[in-house]
């Protein structure tokens, strides 16, 4: 089955992807937990060289919130999602394809006045959604970084 999803289904997926992005950018890991499917496909090949075909949501939260990744309190991000296309792949699964720009700034200290490093990624992302108990949940992502600005490759880890 591959078809255009109903408008209500797309709206449900848009709500989930919005909350996913806002959760990342505000570091609101409790909010993130509310929109995740129980298991997820995480293809971070271009981000950290790893892929998880079936990651429990309870494992994704510590990955995302790790201080060496998005949980760094000195790191500010904006996951901006542009135009999207949607494909219904089963009664309870939808795939989204999006234009994406993710801005990153890491500050020198907790005063958040001096930018120590910045790096922005441009490209797309494939996202997956599953309907769980009648609600569309964020079930994974695969960023496609086509190009980057500044020091994107230095945004994460011990740098």
Swiss-Prot record:
This chain's function reads: Dehydratase; part of the gene cluster that mediates the biosynthesis of dibenzodioxocinones such as pestalotiollide B, a novel class of inhibitors against cholesterol ester transfer protein (CEPT). The biosynthesis initiates from condensation of acetate and malonate units catalyzed by the non-reducing PKS pks8/GME11356. Pks8/GME11356 lacks a thioesterase (TE) domain, which is important to the cyclizing of the third ring of atrochrysone carboxylic acid, and the esterase GME11355 might play the role of TE and catalyzes the cyclization reaction of the C ring.
Its UniProt pathway annotation is:
Secondary metabolite biosynthesis
Question: What is the active site of this protein?
Answer: 79, 104
GO BP term, pick one: melanin metabolic process
Name the Pfam families on file. Scytalone_dh
How does the record describe its quaternary structure? Homotrimer. Each subunit contains an active site, located in the central part of the hydrophobic core of the monomer, which functions independently.
Recite the UniProt keywords alphabetically: Lyase
What name goes with this protein? Dehydratase GME11372
- In the record, what lineage is assigned to the organism producing the protein? Eukaryota, Fungi, Dikarya, Ascomycota, Pezizomycotina
């Amino acid at each position: 089955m591959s078809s255009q999803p109903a408008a209500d289904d797309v709206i449900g997926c848009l709500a989930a992807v919005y909350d996913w992005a806002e959760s990342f950018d505000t570091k609101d890991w409790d909010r993130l937990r509310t929109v995740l499917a129980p298991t997820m496909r995480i293809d971070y090949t271009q981000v950290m060289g790893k892929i998880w075909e079936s990651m429990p949501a309870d494992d994704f939260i510590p990955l995302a919130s790790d201080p060496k990744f998005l949980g760094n309190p000195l790191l500010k991000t904006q996951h901006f999602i542009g135009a999207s296309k949607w494909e219904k792949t089963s009664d309870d699964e939808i795939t989204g394809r999006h234009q994406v720009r993710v801005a990153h700034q890491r500050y020198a200290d907790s005063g958040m006045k001096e930018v120590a490093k910045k790096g922005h990624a441009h490209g797309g992302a494939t996202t997956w959604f599953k309907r769980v108990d009648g609600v569309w949940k964020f079930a994974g992502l695969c960023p496609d970084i086509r190009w980057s600005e500044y020091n994107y490759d230095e945004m994460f880890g011990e740098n």
